[in-house]
């Protein structure tokens, strides 16, 4: 039964990742905890497997469409590794309830920022804001990129969510990428950061339920293929607004379950 549930939820998670370039961990962590009964630390470790594999498949569509900044994405991803290693080690030392509460707070903050940005864009911002062509790192400065990447990596490792929901806002707000290009490039960063975060959990008390997690990941990869083309059909402002609403919705659900526990 758990494997069947994982297959169903995995497809939905994959569609979100493919369409938005983010959101896999946001959905897989609560799903593994509340639908499949896993411990928060185990769920966060398992979600890194799901997000990393899903991101690999989901990267195909934006790469073909030219919406991936390979140099900036690879640089950002490599710079996030140290933060991911430190964050993963810090995470296992925190109580599961505290981990979820902090996760909820971060979802609220990022969700509000992205929702407001999407609404402002709808009121007249240019859909192509931030050309994203060559050298975003150079335009903003190496220190800003390094700080954003390290911070992203730490939060990725700490919460075990792959980092897409942090990477997309960072690429948009710190590096000036358009939303569609940030979504595509974030998948590359997610692959690097989730791999580093998972490696850092080796030897800790986090356990991955491999049959469930691999079923979840396989279904999510299928969903990622289905979700990729959706990016072409939606405006940048719509994607940004939908992303913010998604984060706030998951935040509300997590807060409700924490208070009801």
Label every PLM stretch briefly.
Residues 28-42, 166-181, 200:
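Interfacial segments of multi-pass membrane proteins
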Residues 46-61:
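Transmembrane alpha-helices of multi-pass small-molecule transport proteins
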Residues 1-15, 34-35, 40, 60-158, ...:
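Juxtamembrane transmembrane-helix boundary motif
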Residues 47-51, 186-190, 212-213, 217:
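Short hydrophobic/aromatic, small-residue-rich stretches within specific transmembrane helices
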Residues 45, 73, 183-184, 244:
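Conserved glycine-rich helix-kink/hinge and helix-boundary motifs of the Major Facilitator Superfamily
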Residues 29, 53-56, 112, 168, ...:
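Alpha-helical transmembrane segments of polytopic integral membrane proteins
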Residues 19, 154, 158, 191-199:
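Hydrophobic alpha-helical segments of membrane proteins
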Residues 17-26, 156-163, 181:
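Short helix-coil transition sites and intra-membrane helix breaks within transmembrane domains
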